[in-house]
């Protein structure tokens, strides 16, 4: 996917997905230490909810701290907040779907990610195969793309929780998978929230 695609001005495609997956993992209780390291590697701002509680700016909005001091377009801060709120909401739904993922599936997926000889494409295929296995557990009343997005990020969370050293690889594979298969849905989700 072209990284220059964006939702009007603001964040590019991969940055939207970076923030969405990072926010989901953060809201889902992944280990803080690994997330802090990952957050520093992101080319966009990421912030910790716990660090920001009770910290307001003069205009009354919540403050945000940057792990990376890269240049951000002026209107992207509000877009980042919207993406973070979407991620938090999806994580809450994911908590309700969590029981649908069997521990054996998580262990198998973690073992596949530990295989150093697998290419990024092979890892995405392993993730797709795992998603096919849990597809029957998608809530019937939920839009398929939404369920697929949540389950993709939920699998990433469970693998990272099972083997924290895999967080970086699982994160990047998940972002790439979403950008290839679900980005139109993600873009529309962000656009709808911004309206």
Curated annotation (Swiss-Prot):
Motif position, BH3: 87-100
Modified residue annotations for Phosphoserine: 78
Region (Disordered): 58-77
Effect of residue 98 to A: Loss of proteolytical cleavage leading to the production of p11 BID
Biological process (GO), any one: regulation of apoptotic process
UniProt keywords, alphabetically: Acetylation, Apoptosis, Cytoplasm, Membrane, Mitochondrion, Mitochondrion outer membrane, Phosphoprotein, Ubl conjugation
UniProt site positions, description: Cleavage: 59-60, 75-76, 98-99
Highest rank taxon of the organism: Eukaryota
Modified residue annotations for N-acetylmethionine: 1
Molecular function as annotated in GO: ubiquitin protein ligase binding
Matches recorded under InterPro entries: Bcl-2-like_sf (IPR036834), Bcl2_BH3_motif_CS (IPR020728), BID (IPR010479)
SUPFAM superfamilies registered for this protein in UniProt: Bcl-2 inhibitors of programmed cell death
Compositionally skewed regions (Polar residues) per UniProt: 58-69
Mitochondrion among keywords: yes
Main location: cytoplasm
Subcellular location: Cytoplasm; Mitochondrion membrane; Mitochondrion outer membrane
Keyword set includes Methyltransferase: no
GO CC field: cytoplasm; cytosol; membrane; mitochondrial membrane; mitochondrial outer membrane; mitochondrion
Domain free text: Intact BH3 motif is required by BIK, BID, BAK, BAD and BAX for their pro-apoptotic activity and for their interaction with anti-apoptotic members of the Bcl-2 family. Apoptotic members of the Bcl-2 family.
Oligomer status and interactors: Forms heterodimers either with the pro-apoptotic protein BAX or the anti-apoptotic protein BCL2. Interacts with PLEKHN1.
PANTHER family tied to this protein: BH3-INTERACTING DOMAIN DEATH AGONIST
Function: Induces caspases and apoptosis. Counters the protective effect of BCL2.
Protein name: BH3-interacting domain death agonist
Classification of source organism: Eukaryota, Metazoa, Chordata, Craniata, Vertebrata
């Amino acid at each position: 996917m072209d990284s220059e695609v964006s939702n009007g001005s603001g964040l590019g495609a991969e940055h939207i997905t970076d923030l969405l997956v990072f926010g989901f993992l953060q809201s889902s209780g992944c280990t803080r230490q690994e997330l802090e390291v990952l957050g520093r590697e992101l080319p966009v701002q990421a912030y910790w909810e716990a660090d920001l509680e009770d910290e307001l700016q003069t205009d009354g909005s919540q403050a945000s701290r940057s792990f990376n001091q890269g240049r951000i377009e002026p209107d992207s801060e509000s877009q980042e907040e919207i993406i973070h709120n979407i991620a938090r909401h999806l994580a809450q739904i994911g908590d309700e779907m969590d029981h649908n993922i069997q521990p054996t599936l998580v262990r198998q997926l973690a073992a596949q990610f530990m295989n150093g000889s697998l290419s990024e494409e092979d890892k995405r295929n392993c993730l797709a195969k795992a998603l096919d296995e849990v597809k029957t557990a998608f809530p019937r009343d939920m839009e398929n793309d939404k369920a697929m997005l949540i389950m993709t990020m939920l699998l990433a969370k469970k693998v990272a929780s099972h083997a924290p050293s895999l967080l970086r690889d699982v994160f990047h594979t998940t972002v790439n998978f979403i950008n290839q298969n679900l980005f139109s849905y993600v873009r529309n989700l962000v656009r709808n929230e911004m309206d």
